[in-house]
């Protein structure tokens, strides 16, 4: 079954870094996406805020460059996480993060 998502946007919530009891580092943040997409021949505004998590030692170096306002492209897969309040939320599990050059 295919489960791939590529999403570009701006980090809108400060990264939270944690280490699991088994020693695996995790970095969590929220990515805000805004764009204009074409659907059925019409242009429409597309907007979402997507929680992102990236795990593992090999992926943590790029996360130290990420702050609120950083523009990035994230590639990975989506999965549901159950929150403490019992509600499920969709989360993008990043496998690759690329910083977008703002041109400054």
Swiss-Prot record:
Domain (SSB) ranges: 1-101
HAMAP family: PriB
Assigned protein family: Belongs to the PriB family.
Superkingdom of origin organism: Bacteria
Record's GO cellular component terms: primosome complex
Subunit structure, as described in the record: Homodimer. Interacts with PriA and DnaT. Component of the replication restart primosome. Primosome assembly occurs via a 'hand-off' mechanism. PriA binds to replication forks, subsequently PriB then DnaT bind; DnaT then displaces ssDNA to generate the helicase loading substrate.
Protein name, as recorded: Replication restart protein PriB
GO molecular function annotation: single-stranded DNA binding
């Amino acid at each position: 079954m295919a489960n791939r998502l590529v999403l570009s946007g701006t980090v809108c919530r400060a990264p939270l870094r944690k280490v699991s009891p088994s020693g695996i580092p995790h970095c969590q943040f929220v990515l805000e996406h805004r764009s204009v997409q074409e659907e059925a021949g019409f242009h429409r505004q597309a907007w979402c805020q997507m929680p992102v998590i990236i795990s593992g030692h090999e992926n943590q170096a790029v996360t130290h460059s990420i702050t609120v306002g950083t523009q990035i492209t994230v590639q990975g897969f989506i999965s549901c996480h159950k929150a403490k309040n019992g509600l499920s939320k969709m989360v993008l599990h990043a496998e690759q993060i690329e910083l977008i050059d703002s041109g400054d």
